[in-house]
Every structure is written in structure tokens, then in C-alpha cells.
């Protein structure tokens, strides 16, 4: 098929950032189309159906929750710029969350959507550090100071200026890394500030039906604004002449042109699509991008713009497995009703890195989607617990199918055993009778359904805050631009659309 269409803006990927960018651009009359390889929108924050049940992937809770009328926050900006009434998301606040360390769970910090709760707990359990904690919070840059240029300074060094107790340092980093770090055992200072505000100074909330509510709202806003969307229709190549993308070749053979291209699929993934149309050559030469940058022939180098040496985004190393257990009763009936999210680690030191084995069950995140303060009659009918642990993509990707399925079951049991050490005890037979369904996804699943290389949920550790690529009309939005999670992705799409298209 050789049909050809032109758009003001083509967006690669129908994830949260792509949808947000599309809505923003369509509001201002731009002819925009989103091209998505998969059959479901949402990207890393989507859902799937299995045996008649819908399971969220990605979203545990919406971060950055603030109440009505609070100004200068990411949530407020998103609602305003996407023209969403906050009631459309039906956000219910968390009950309360914990950070638990030690083999017996002996070190505990509580936090809620009231920052005073965590501060009071630190004052009680780490009295010598309370002044440092308050000074640390006061030193966090505001949102208006973030994002102009990446501050890749070690967040551990930054926190070390204020907090001396190594246990408290590890406990502070545990939830922030699990919910937003692409770097092993550290964070960029900017990312630390964003996540600390999102979790500790703002908070968690969730719609009754999870990510499906958010997606329904976004898709309807995009449709009403006049945006086009093509599902199961990915981009296979970005053909470039000189320093500009000239054509997008779709997987079905169609050719699309656009004045601007916004890509939400990741930095490395986007660059892997680029094909240089070089005058004088018989055929375009693909540019192969690796962790050390481009592998280019002398011929192609003579014809392409010299690339910024700093623009060598490596593939991310951090991926996860997640188990899901569905109950025929609410978690509180089992004695698990007070926790919304539990971040656990079974020693005093938190090791946030790609594990040597398939899974690292020593630490993880336990989420109870039922344990939010839903309006009457709006809580999920069935109970659920989700447990997330670090995983090694390479140890999963090449397994024969029979071994793969067996390993999933083996690790499901091991992850449950590890997580339950940090929850009130429930007899095995009671839990077995209450369980009506289970599932598990792995790094291999993540790559299959999102196309993210190495199952890297948080993308490359090298972020590009201005979204610029070696091509002057191709820009990044989403995880590799630097904002993560649902709120971060939405904000990224809005910001990149504003910066690169609407302000020109």
C-alpha cells in the first residue's frame, strides 16, 4: 500500500505522554495523528483481560495527588491544560503506606497524603535526623526550577548533606527508586526532587477502575478535540534527509509526512527507527545505535549532521516482575486493610540494581488497589494484591516456553513468600480458599506488549529533558524525556508539545 498523508504532527506511541501531547495539540487546531503498534493504548500504563477479569499494568497509584485549589502542582497543570475536570478521574486518596526494612520488618516508617505523618515518624524513630530531614525538604527545588537542564548529580551525595544515618537514607530512597529511577543504586538530583515531592509532599490516589478510567478520559478528550488515532499501525522507519525527518514509513507500507514528530517510545527505540536518505546512495543506510553511540559508515558520516557527543542514551537495565492475586473478599477481611502500599527490603541496605538471578525477592512493592478511600459503592468488588520485584531481562528473554512457564510459577510462589513477611500473618488455608485467580508478568511480557528494549520500565538512565534528538523536527516525550509514572508522562507530553510545536 503506497498511500500518503500529511500531518502537522505525527506522534509515535499511544502511551500517556503521546495521548497528552495529542490532546494539547488538537486543542490548538493542529492536524495530529497517533500511531500505535499495539492494540491497546496506555503503553507502560495499560490493562489487559484474562478469563473475564481486567488487570492493570503499571499503575499502582497516581502520584502527585493534591486537593482542589492547590496551585503550582503537576496535577493542577495537567487538568488545566488538558481541560479535564478533576471529578472525571474519580480520584480516591490512599489510606496509608509503609516503608519496612529488616529481616523481621523491624524498621518502619509510615506516610500518608499528609506530609506531617512521615515527619512525625522520623522525629520519633530517628530523632537525631529530624532537623536534617526538614532541611532536606526545604532544599528541594520547586517544580518551576526543574527540567530546564538535567542535574545528573548523585542524589545520594545530595541527601548525604542532610541525613547521616545510613538506614534512614536507604529507607528514603527505597520508594523513590522503585517508583521512578532508571539509575542503579542512585538517582539524578532532579529526579529525586520530583519523586520526593510526588510521594512524600503530595501523595497517592487512584480511580475506582484504575488506569482504565484515566485512559477513557484521555481518549475521549482526544477524540472530541479532533485527533486521529491508528492502532495496530506502528512506525517501522523514520526516513531522514540531512538533519530532518522527511517520511514515516508505517508497518503496513504506508508513507506519512509530518512537520513535527513526537516520539513516546523511548530514546534508543526512536533512534533505532532512523534511516538516513543520503543523496547519491543506491539505498538508504540504516544507522545502528548501541550503548556507545552510532555505528556509522564513512559514507553516511559524510552526509549527516555531526551529532552531539553527549547524546548517547544507553538502554536501561532495570526491569520488574509483578504478581497479581485476586481474592473473593476484600483485603481487610484477611487483616490486610490498613496498608495501601508497602515498600519492603529485608536488610539495612537497599540494593536497587539488575539482579544476577531472574528475580530479586529481597525487596519489592506490595500494592492493595482496594485500600483507597473510595466513594460509597465504588470500591472494587474483588480483592487484589500486587507484588513487584526487580528482575533480570536477560534471564527471561531466551527461555524455552516450557521453562519460561515453569519459572513464572516458581517465582510467583517465592515472591509471595517474601512479601508476606512484611504483612500481618494469614493462615495458608485461608489464603488458598480466598484466592480465585492469579497472574504474573515478567520483563519478557513488558517488551512483548510495549516494545521497550530490555523491559526497561523507566527507560534509559540518560534523560533528555528538552526532548531534542539529532533530527531537528523529531522530539522525545515520556520516560526518556525525564518524567515517569502516569502524572510524569502526561506532564511530559504537554510540556514537549508546548515547547516544540505550539510556541514556534
Residue ranges and their predicted role:
Residues 165, 169-179, 365, 424-483:
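A glycine-rich dinucleotide-binding beta-alpha-beta segment and adjacent secondary-structure elements
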Residues 178-205, 469-472:
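Active-site-adjacent "gating/activation" loops or surface patches in catalytic cores
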Residues 104-189:
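Rossmann-like flavin
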Residues 195-245:
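Helical element adjacent to the flavin cofactor pocket in flavoenzyme catalytic cores
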Residues 329-437:
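C-terminal segments that line or cap access tunnels to active or ligand-binding sites in enzymes
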Residues 236-281, 287, 298-379:
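Mid-domain catalytic core of redox enzymes
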Residues 479-501:
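A conserved FAD-binding loop/helix module that cradles the flavin
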Residues 2-131:
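N-terminal glycine-rich phosphate/pyrophosphate-binding loop and immediately adjacent elements
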